[in-house]
Regions:
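Transmembrane alpha-helices and immediately adjacent membrane-cytoplasm interface residues
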Residues: 1-2
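Acidic-basic catalytic patches of nuclease active cores, encompassing PD-(D/E)XK
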Residues: 7-74
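Conserved beta-strand termini and adjacent loop/short-helix elements that scaffold enzyme active sites
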Residues: 69-71, 136, 162-166
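A short, glycine/Asx- and small/polar-enriched loop/turn
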Residues: 77-80
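Active-site beta-strand-loop-beta-strand hairpin of nuclease catalytic cores
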Residues: 82-94
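Catalytic cores of nucleic-acid endonucleases
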Residues: 91, 96-160
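Short acidic-hydrophobic, aromatic-tinged amphipathic segments that line or gate anion-handling sites
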Residues: 156-171
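Short, surface-exposed amphipathic charged segments that create phosphate/polyanion-binding patches used
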Residues: 172-177
């Protein structure tokens, strides 16, 4: 297939964009560029750790190994995914979204629209896919979990969505150095 591992520079840029997305959807209005840059650089390692832990959790659920940070090239367009696996002619596409505080409907809708575009692209190519989205909450509550799950079950019941507690993932997959 056309799936290729991201280079170090591409991976760093992906993490930077995700950190900016998290900040822009947060409750704080950021005014100073220096402040934004500092926050982005502080968030990047957290986002990377969240993705690693979420991929481990998804691997344990599905019993297959995922390759992290891959791109799919189609007609000179690059599509970047947090993780990818293939089993029995089905492509598993995984996207992880880290949520520090509350999550807005706008962000939920944005993730949904992105996944639906990807789904249509693969369908047009005749490729069987399973899309998995995981929201990893820094401040996990059952109300937030239900809010996310209810949104997706009402508008995209065919999409597989998980909501994980970041602290529980850290405990479950902690490694002794």
């Amino acid at each position: 297939a056309n799936f290729v591992k991201l280079t170090g520079k591409e991976s760093t840029e992906k993490l930077r964009k995700e950190a900016v997305e998290i900040i822009s959807h947060g409750n704080n209005v950021l005014r100073e560029t220096k402040n934004v840059t500092e926050k982005v650089h502080a968030l990047m390692p957290i986002v990377e750790n969240v993705e690693k832990l979420a991929v481990k959790k998804i691997e344990s659920i599905y019993g297959i190994q995922f390759q992290r940070e891959v791109q799919y090239v189609l007609n000179r367009h690059r599509y970047i995914f947090d993780a990818f696996a293939q089993k029995d002619e089905i492509f598993y596409i995984f996207e992880c979204k880290y949520v520090r505080n509350a999550i807005s409907r706008e962000r939920l809708r944005s993730v949904l629209e992105q996944m639906l575009r990807y789904k249509q692209m693969f369908k047009d190519q005749g490729i069987a896919t399973k899309f998995i989205v995981a929201f990893v909450l820094d401040e996990f509550t059952e109300n937030r979990q239900h809010e996310i799950m209810d949104f997706y079950s009402s508008v995209a019941p065919e999409m597989t969505v998980y909501v994980f507690d970041f602290n529980k993932l850290k405990v479950e997959f902690s490694t002794k150095s």
